[in-house]
Swiss-Prot record:
Compartments, record wording: Nucleus, Nuclear pore complex
Assigned protein family: Belongs to the nucleoporin GLFG family.
Segments of skewed composition (Polar residues): 1-34, 117-171, 533-560, 831-846
Per-repeat ranges for Sequence: 2-3, 8-9, 17-18, 23-24, 41-42, 56-57, 64-65, 79-80, 87-88, 94-95, 103-104, 109-110, 124-125, 135-136, 140-141, 146-147, 154-155, 162-163, 170-171, 178-179, 186-187, 194-195, 202-203, 210-211, 217-218, 222-223, 228-229, 236-237, 244-245, 252-253, 260-261, 268-269, 276-277, 284-285, 294-295, 300-301, 307-308, 312-313, 319-320, 329-330, 334-335, 339-340, 411-412, 427-428, 459-460, 466-467, 471-472, 480-481, 491-492, 497-498, 506-507, 514-515, 521-522, 533-534, 555-556, 562-563, 565-566, 573-574, 586-587, 604-605, 627-628, 632-633, 650-651, 655-656, 676-677
Pfam families referenced in this protein's UniProt entry, alphabetically: Nucleoporin2
Keyword Nucleus: yes
Organism: Arabidopsis thaliana (Mouse-ear cress)
InterPro entries: Nucleoporin_S59-like (IPR037665), Nup98_auto-Pept-S59_dom (IPR007230), Nup98_auto-Pept-S59_dom_sf (IPR036903)
Gene Ontology terms: cellular component: cytoplasm; nuclear envelope; nuclear membrane; nuclear pore; nucleus
Name under which the protein is recorded: Nuclear pore complex protein NUP98A
C-alpha cells in the first residue's frame, strides 16, 4: 500500500505496515510488520476476534475482527484478550465470546449486547464469513473493490489498481459507480456499493448496507457478507445477535435492519427508531431495550427513556435525530406537554424580538420585528388569539405564581423543543430547531445553548451552564472536541426570563473561565450584553471586575453582586458614610453619602445617586444583580424616600418595573419595557410630584396610561372672580300671564352668558378676597318694572363727612319682578333710610351719578359678617362689551379693556378711537371717546360682504352723537377693480381711476366722505357723521366701471 509495489489494496508479499494484506487481509507473519513487536497489542486474536489473530489484519482472510493466526501488531492477546483478560473478559479479545462480559454477555463490547444472552463470537463481524477480506473481497480492492462487482479495485472491474483499467473506476460507465445501474459502484443497484441495493443507498429498504449486499466496501469483508453493515451478515459489529448495537441487515441509515451499530436488540442506549434516515430499526445506539438511560429503554437521548427524552416529553430519535414533537428537559416536564398538556397563551415562549430576514446589509445588523406575532412560536396567531388563550388559562396579567417561570418550559425552554441530548443528528448534522439540553442549536436550552458547528457531537455543544462555558471551559466546549458556537445557556441565555440579549445570568459574558472568561464566578458582561436578570451594571456575582476595565476589590468595587454595602465609586475602605465621614468597606449600609458628586451602591448592588440610602432607588439604568437587582432588566428612576419604588426584596423594581418619579404618593406601576414579560403583582407605591394615577397592565396589548395631573390649588389672589358669581343663579320665576306688565324672557342675557374667564382674570389680584360678591342691580334692569316701597329701599352708609353715596334708581332698587314676587336678591334687602346715617343727618340725592357710588351695603346678615362689596372689582366683566363671535374683534381687545378698567375705573366710559371689525370684511373706528360699557356689539354692528350696518333696528338707534351713532371711519375690504369677463384685477390705469371716481360718488350719495381707496389691497375708507347702512352693491360697480 503505502510504499509497496502493489496498487492500493492489491496483494503483495510484503507490506510496509506489517502484513501482506491490507486492512483486515491475509498476512504471513508478524515479521513483515515494521511497527509490530513480537507480541501483538494484547493477544494473538484480532480486535474482538475469536482466536489469537491480527487485530487490524490477520493471516487468513478474516474481516475486521475475524479470527486470525497472527496479528500485525502482536502475537499474543489483543486488547483485552485471553490470557490476561482485558476490559472485563476472560480469554476472548475485546468482545470475544467464551468468557463473560461485564456488559451483560460473554462478549466484550457488543458481542452479547448489553444484557442479551445470544452468544456471538465476533463483535465487529461474523465468524461465518471469515474467509472474506475486510474492505473488499480478498484485499482492499482485490476481488471486489470499493463499489465494483467481482474483482476490481475502488470501483474497477477485474484486478485493477486504485480505480483502474478495464471496468470503470469510481462510478464509471460499464460498471457504474456512485449509484449507477448495472454493476454500479458506490451505492448502485444490482450489486450495490456504499449503502446501495436494488432500493436506494442512503437509507435504502430491503437489505441495505453501508455499502450494499454482495459487493465492495464491506461486501464480504469488514465483518459481514454485506457491505458496511449490510444485510446477511451485518457490518461493523452487526450479526444475528447484534454487535455494537447492530442487527441483521440494514445499512448506514437503512430501513429494515439498522446499520452502524443498530439492532433489534439494542446496544449502547439504542431504541426502536431507525438510523440516520433509516426506517424501522434504529442506528447508532438505537434499540428497544433500555441500556444507558435515565428512563425506561431508549437510546442516549431516545424516545422512551433517555434523560429528558420521553420521561420529559421527547419523541424517539436516533443518536442525533432531532424529533421536534415533544419538548425536552423542561419543555414538557416543567409545565408543558407531558405534565399537563400543551400550554398556549402569550407566556408559552418568552418574548424576544424577531430578526427580520434579508434586512442586514454589510455592517448594519438585521432589523428586528417588535411583535409577538412575528415570533416563530406565535406566527400562526394574532394578538387577540393569544389574549384569548391567556384568558382560557386564567392568565389576566400580573406575575406568575411563585416558582413558575415565564415560559411553559422548565428553565425558559420553548415548549416545542425536541430531544434532550442531541438537537442535531449524531455526526454533526443539523436538524430543524433542535433545542437540546446537552447539545442545543438555536433555541434556549438550559444545558447547552446554541447551534453546534459541523462535527460537533451529541455530548458537546457551544457553551455551557453558568456563563458561557461549563466552569471555565473554553467556548469550544464540545465533549468530543468538535467546535461549536459561543452563545450562552440557560442561566445566561437570551430567553429564559424574557431577556433578549445573549448574556448570562450573573453578569458574565461569553468568554469562559474564572478570570478572562464568562462564568458564574467571574467576569462582567460584554458590551451590549444584558444579563438574564437584568443587571445593567457590569457587576458580577463574586466581585469580578467589569469588562470595561473597572477595578476594585471585594469591598470597594462599584455594583458587585452582594453589594458593597453603600459604597460609592471611591476606594474600598474610605468612602463617605451616612455622616459624611470615611467608613470601612461595609459603611453606609443604611444610608449613602450625602455628597452631590459621587454615586454610591446600595447594600445589595444597586448604584444610587448621592444622598440616597441603599434601600432607596438607584439612578435610572443603574440596576444591579444580587438581592437588589431590578429583576428583569428595567431601569429604575430615583426616589427620595421609601424603597426603590418596587416591591422587590431590598429595593429592586418588581418584575421589571421602574419606580415612579419624585414626590407624590400615588399607586403607579410604570411601563414594562418588555411588553410580554412579567407584570407587577400590584401597583407600586412611590413618591411623585404630579398626581399620576395608576396604569394597570393586563394582557398583551396593555399599555401604560398616565392621566392628567391632579389640579394644583391656586392662590386666592389669582382666582378669577367671575367664577364665583357665575355660580350664583336666580331661581326660576313663575310666569303668570294674567297679570299686567310686559312679558320678560325666562333667562336674561347675563344668565345665559358664558362663564369663560377673561384673559386678565388670572393676572389681576382680588381687591378683597373675603368680600361678598354679587351682581349689580343694573344687570336685571329689564325686570325693574315696579319700584320697591320706600321702606324697602336699601340705603348706603354715610361717609365720615355725613354724605351718603349715590343710590341711583336703577342701581339701588332690587325691585319686584313682573308678577310681584321679590327677586332672590331683593328679598334679603331690609334696610331703612336712616339706618346708617351719621349724626349730621345729611344724605345725597338718589340721582347722583354711578361714578360717585363706590359702595353699597346689604343688611340682613348676622352681626360681624362682611357686607360691603367693592362694586368696581366685582363687576368688571359686566361692564365689558359683549362680542362672542370669533371672527369679530375690537381694539383695544376686551381683555385689555378689563385690565384698564381695573387699573383706571371708568376707563370704559371714555375709550378713545374704539374699533370694531370683522376679519376679512372691514372695520369701524369710532372717532373720539366712546362709552363701551355693556354694549352688545354683536347685535349693534354687523359686517357683510362689502357692507357694514350699525343699528340695524332703527327704532333702537340713539340720537346722533350718543352710543355708536357717532362720527366714525369705515374701512370696507374686498373692494377691487376686477374685469368680470376675465377675472383680472386692475391695480392701476384708467379703469382704476374710473373705479375710484365711482367710489367717491357712492360715498357722497350715502352722506359719507371719501377718504381713500387702495386698489392693491382692495380697501375703501370713508368717514360718516352718523350710522345706518353703508354698502357698495354690484350694480354700483357696473355703473361706475
Amino acid at each position: 500500500m503505502f510504499g509497496s509495489s502493489n496498487p492500493f489494496g492489491q496483494s503483495s508479499g510484503t507490506s510496509p505496515f506489517g502484513s501482506q494484506s491490507l486492512f483486515g487481509q491475509t498476512s504471513n507473519t508478524s515479521s513483515n510488520n515494521p511497527f509490530a513487536p513480537a507480541t501483538p497489542f494484547g493477544t494473538s486474536a484480532p480486535f474482538a476476534a475469536q482466536s489469537g489473530s491480527s487485530i487490524f489484519g490477520s493471516t487468513s482472510t478474516g474481516v475486521f475482527g475475524a479470527p486470525q493466526t497472527s496479528s500485525p501488531f502482536a502475537s499474543t492477546p489483543t486488547f483485552g484478550a485471553s490470557s490476561s483478560p482485558a476490559f472485563g473478559n476472560s480469554t476472548p479479545a475485546f468482545g470475544a465470546s467464551p468468557a463473560s462480559s461485564p456488559f451483560g454477555g460473554s462478549s466484550g463490547f457488543g458481542q452479547k449486547p448489553l444484557g442479551f444472552s445470544t452468544p456471538q463470537s465476533n463483535p465487529f463481524g461474523n465468524s461465518t464469513q471469515q474467509s472474506q477480506p475486510a474492505f473488499g473481497n480478498t484485499s482492499f480492492g482485490s476481488s471486489t473493490p470499493f463499489g465494483a462487482t467481482n474483482t476490481p479495485a475502488f470501483g474497477a472491474p477485474s484486478t485493477p489498481s486504485f480505480g483502474a483499467t478495464s471496468t470503470p473506476s469510481f462510478g464509471a460507465s460499464s460498471t457504474p459507480a456512485f449509484g449507477a445501474t448495472n454493476t454500479p459502484a458506490f451505492g448502485a443497484s444490482n450489486s450495490p456499493s456504499f449503502g446501495a441495493t436494488n432500493t436506494p443507498a442512503f437509507g435504502a429498504s430491503p437489505t441495505p448496507a453501508f455499502g450494499s449486499t454482495g459487493t465492495t466496501f464491506g461486501n464480504t469483508g469488514f465483518g459481514s457478507g454485506g457491505a458496511f453493515g449490510a444485510s446477511n451478515t451485518p457490518a461493523f459489529g452487526a450479526s444475528g445477535t447484534p454487535a455494537f448495537g447492530a442487527s441483521g441487515t440494514p445499512a448506514f441509515g437503512a430501513s429494515s435492519t439498522p446499520a452502524f451499530g443498530a439492532s433489534s436488540t439494542p446496544a449502547f442506549g439504542a431504541s426502536s427508531t431507525p438510523a440516520f434516515g433509516g426506517s424501522s430499526t434504529p442506528s447508532f445506539g438505537a434499540s428497544n431495550t433500555s441500556s444507558f438511560s435515565f428512563g425506561s429503554s431508549p437510546a442516549f437521548g431516545q424516545s422512551t427513556s433517555a434523560f429528558g427524552s420521553s420521561a420529559f416529553g421527547s419523541t424517539p430519535s436516533p443518536f442525533g435525530g432531532a424529533q421536534a414533537s415533544t419538548p425536552t428537559f423542561g419543555g414538557s416536564g416543567f409545565g408543558q406537554s407531558t405534565f399537563g398538556g400543551q400550554q398556549g397563551g402569550s407566556r408559552a415562549v418568552p418574548y424576544a424580538p424577531t430578526v427580520e430576514a434579508d434586512t442586514g446589509t454589510g455592517t448594519q445588523p438585521a432589523g428586528k420585528l417588535e411583535s409577538i406575532s412575528a415570533m416563530p412560536a406565535y406566527k400562526e396567531k394574532n394578538y387577540e388569539e393569544l389574549r384569548w388563550e391567556d384568558y382560557q388559562r386564567g392568565d389576566k396579567g400580573g406575575p406568575l405564581p411563585a416558582g413558575q417561570s415565564p415560559g411553559n418550559a422548565g428553565f425558559g425552554i420553548s415548549p416545542s423543543q425536541p430531544n434532550p441530548f442531541s438537537p442535531s443528528p449524531a455526526f454533526g448534522q443539523t436538524s430543524a430547531n433542535p433545542t437540546n439540553p446537552f447539545s442545543s442549536s438555536t433555541s434556549t436550552n438550559p444545558f447547552a445553548p446554541q447551534t453546534p458547528t459541523i462535527a460537533s457531537s451529541s455530548f458537546g455543544t457551544a457553551t455551557s451552564n453558568f456563563g458561557s462555558s461549563p466552569f471555565g471551559v473554553t467556548s469550544s466546549s464540545n465533549l468530543f472536541g468538535s467546535g461549536s458556537s459561543t452563545t450562552t445557556s440557560v442561566f445566561g441565555s437570551s430567553s429564559a426570563f424574557g431577556t433578549t440579549t445573549p448574556s448570562p445570568l450573573f453578569g458574565s459574558s461569553s468568554t469562559p473561565g474564572f478570570g478572562s472568561s464568562s462564568s458564574i464566578f467571574g467576569s462582567a458582561p460584554g458590551q451590549g450584553a444584558t444579563p438574564a436578570f437584568g443587571n445593567s451594571q457590569p457587576s458580577t456575582l463574586f466581585n469580578s471586575t467589569p469588562s470595561t476595565g473597572q477595578t476594585g476589590s471585594a469591598f470597594g468595587q462599584t455594583g458587585s453582586a452582594f453589594g458593597q454595602f453603600g459604597q460609592s465609586s471611591a476606594p474600598a475602605f474610605g468612602q463617605n458614610s451616612i455622616f459624611n465621614k470615611p467608613s470601612t468597606g461595609f459603611g453606609n449600609m443604611f444610608s449613602s453619602s450625602s455628597t452631590l458628586t459621587t454615586s454610591s451602591s446600595s447594600p445589595f448592588g444597586q448604584t444610587m445617586p448621592a444622598g440616597v440610602t441603599p434601600f432607596q432607588s438607584a439612578q435610572p439604568g443603574q440596576a444591579s444583580n444580587g438581592f437588589g437587582f431590578n429583576n428583569f432588566g428595567q431601569n429604575q428612576a430615583a426616589n427620595t424616600t421609601g424603597n426603590a419604588g418596587g416591591l422587590g426584596i431590598f429595593g429592586q423594581g418588581n418584575f421589571g418595573q421602574s419606580p415612579a418619579p419624585l414626590n407624590s404618593v400615588v399607586l403607579q406601576p410604570v411601563a414594562v419595557t418588555n411588553p410580554f414579560g412579567t407584570l407587577p403583582a400590584m401597583p407600586q407605591i412611590s413618591i411623585n410630584q404630579g398626581g399620576n394615577s395608576p396604569s394597570i397592565q393586563y394582557g398583551i396589548s396593555s399599555m401604560p396610561v398616565v392621566d392628567k395631573p391632579a389640579p394644583v390649588r391656586i392662590s386666592s389672589l389669582l382666582t378669577s372672580r367671575h367664577l364665583l358669581h357665575r355660580r350664583v343663579r336666580l331661581p326660576a320665576r313663575k310666569y303668570r300671564p294674567g297679570e299686567n306688565g310686559p312679558k320678560v324672557p325666562f333667562f336674561t342675557d347675563d344668565e345665559e352668558s358664558s362663564s369663560t374667564p377673561k384673559a386678565d382674570a388670572l393676572f389681576i389680584p382680588r381687591e378683597n378676597p373675603r368680600a361678598l360678591v354679587i351682581r349689580p342691580v343694573q344687570q336685571w334692569s329689564s325686570r325693574d318694572k315696579s319700584i320697591l316701597p320706600k321702606e324697602q329701599r336699601p340705603t348706603a352708609p354715610l361717609h365720615d363727612n355725613g354724605k351718603s353715596p349715590d343710590m341711583a334708581t336703577d342701581a339701588a332698587n332690587h325691585d319686584r319682578n313682573g308678577n310681584g314676587e321679590l327677586g332672590a336678591t331683593g328679598e334679603r334687602i331690609h334696610t331703612s333710610v336712616n339706618a346708617n346715617q351719621k349724626p349730621n343727618g345729611t344724605t345725597r340725592s338718589d340721582q347722583a351719578s354711578e361714578k360717585e357710588r363706590p359702595y353699597k351695603t346689604l343688611s340682613g346678615h348676622r352681626a360681624g359678617e362682611a357686607a360691603i362689596v367693592y362694586e368696581h372689582g366685582a363687576d368688571i366683566e359686566a361692564l365689558m362689551p359683549k362680542l362672542r363671535q370669533s371672527d369679530y374683534f375690537t381694539e383695544p381687545r376686551i381683555q385689555e379693556l378689563a385690565a384698564k378698567e381695573r387699573a383706571d375705573p371708568g376707563y370704559c366710559r371714555r375709550v378713545r378711537d374704539f374699533v370694531v371689525g370683522r376679519h376679512g370684511y372691514g372695520s369701524i373706528k369710532f372717532m373720539g371717546e366712546t362709552d363701551v360699557r355693556r354694549l352688545d356689539l354683536e347685535s349693534l354692528v354687523q359686517f357683510n360682504t362689502r357692507e357694514v350696518i350699525v343699528y340695524m333696528d332703527e327704532s333702537k338707534k340713539p340720537a346722533v352723537g350718543q352710543g355708536l351713532n357717532k362720527p366714525a371711519e369705515v374701512t370696507l375690504l374686498n373692494i377691487k377693480c376686477i374685469d368680470k369677463k376675465t377675472g383680472k384685477q386692475f391695480t392701476e390705469g384708467e379703469r382704476v381711476e374710473k373705479y375710484k371716481m365711482m367710489l367717491k360718488k357712492k360715498a357722497e350719495a350715502q352722506g359719507a366722505e371719501f377718504v381713500s381707496f387702495d386698489p392693491v389691497k382692495g380697501e375703501w375708507k370713508f368717514r360718516v357723521e352718523h350710522f345706518s347702512s353703508y354698502k357698495l352693491g354690484d350694480e354700483d360697480e357696473e355703473d361706475g366701471v
